[in-house]
Amino acid sequence: MFKREETKPVFVGGVQIGGQKSVVIQSMTTADTRDVEKTLAEIQRLHDVGCQIVRLAVINEDAARAIKKIKERSPLPLVADIHFDHKLALIALESGIDKIRINPGNIGSKEKTQRVVEACRERNVPIRIGVNSGSVEKRLLDKYGYPSPEAIVESAMDHVQILEDLNYDNIVISLKSSDVPTMIQTYSLMAQKRNYPLHVGVTEAGTQFSGSIKSSVGIGTVLSMGIGDTIRVSLTADPVEEIKVAKQILRSLDIVNNDPVVIACPSCGRCAIDLIGLATKVEDAVSTLKVPLKVAVMGCAVNGPGEAREADVGVAGGNGEGLIFRNGEIVRKVKETELFEELMKEINEIVNEQKPTTVG
């Protein structure tokens, strides 16, 4: 089985996928790609919360041509999502796209596929083969009875073979399913076939709540096996929420440790402060920081500092007041109305010791 450190490095613009321990976070815009300003505004929002690569829907030639203007001002590398029409891929490449998402077996004749491959080769643009449970060919459904992990992998390998026959190996592969166990098994099987980097995700995961859970279980399980080089959390929600979930998945697995994490107790009858409101406010305030920081927001002073002694900094509520602590040691007592501001002072002090960035 090829682990992420053993996969073939592929470059999307200046971002490396594969051949390393780190995992790249992606998303996809919801704006009409032809609307350049709206698309750029969405890309900027995604960039600001930690997205590293963004995909655009290319539904016609106007969208493909709009890529040129978007590319000129985009802070992120761009991926063109293309289905069936090889001309759109060629126009996107001429417009400066950084990566193409196609299935070679679905864009027409061998000659059309070869034209796209040669255009990608000239520009050193990778191709992502994107197979999911809904795109498995009828012959494979007849063979396996349903979109099984084996069927999805065989479908992907058929597309891979087309590119390999053209001596093209600048490839990324995704094999998504809306069924989490199927998705996990599929990536495990694929990791035994080739050392191409894998794009991991649960397709059609659902709304923000249910989709976040399905994606966390599916993506998290695959990543915990050492498999997966880039991820996209698919949610029926603002794409910014996809990035937040993706970052927490990576942080929870210690794949990245340069982002803050907020831990908070579930509250109980001893809690005498607005714990939920405070924890949410703190999480929002530290979300844009790029420092390894663990912040604890605890509901009471009975065992708050002790339970959160591994945190760098935190608060423990009391009756109209609370304790500020660092590394499990109490620093001072403050009024409840001052808890957030005093905690942010401590956080800024820690941040300033590492880099000149402030929040609050």
UniProtKB/Swiss-Prot annotation:
Q: Which of this chain's residues are annotated to bind [4Fe-4S] cluster?
A: 265, 268, 300, 307
Q: Which UniProt keywords apply?
A: 4Fe-4S, Iron, Iron-sulfur, Isoprene biosynthesis, Metal-binding, Oxidoreductase
- Quickly give the catalysed reaction: (2E)-4-hydroxy-3-methylbut-2-enyl diphosphate + oxidized [flavodoxin] + H2O + 2 H(+) = 2-C-methyl-D-erythritol 2,4-cyclic diphosphate + reduced [flavodoxin]
Query: Which cofactor does this sequence's record say it needs?
Result: [4Fe-4S] cluster
The EC designation for this entry is: 1.17.7.3
**Enzyme class, first EC level, given as a word:** oxidoreductase
A Pfam family (short name) is GcpE
SUPFAM superfamilies of this UniProt entry? Answer: Enolase C-terminal domain-like (SSF51604), Nitrite and sulphite reductase 4Fe-4S domain-like (SSF56014)
> Which domain of life does this protein belong to?
Bacteria
- Note on cofactor: Binds 1 [4Fe-4S] cluster.
- Give the metabolic or biological pathway: Isoprenoid biosynthesis; isopentenyl diphosphate biosynthesis via DXP pathway; isopentenyl diphosphate from 1-deoxy-D-xylulose 5-phosphate: step 5/6
**Any GO MF annotation of the entry:** 4-hydroxy-3-methylbut-2-enyl-diphosphate synthase activity (flavodoxin)
**Protein task:** Converts 2C-methyl-D-erythritol 2,4-cyclodiphosphate (ME-2,4cPP) into 1-hydroxy-2-methyl-2-(E)-butenyl 4-diphosphate.
PANTHER family, alphabetized: 4-HYDROXY-3-METHYLBUT-2-EN-1-YL DIPHOSPHATE SYNTHASE (PTHR30454), 4-HYDROXY-3-METHYLBUT-2-EN-1-YL DIPHOSPHATE SYNTHASE (FERREDOXIN), CHLOROPLASTIC (PTHR30454:SF0)
What family is this?
A: Belongs to the IspG family.
What name does this protein carry?
Answer: 4-hydroxy-3-methylbut-2-en-1-yl diphosphate synthase (flavodoxin)
Record organism? Brevibacillus brevis (strain 47 / JCM 6285 / NBRC 100599)
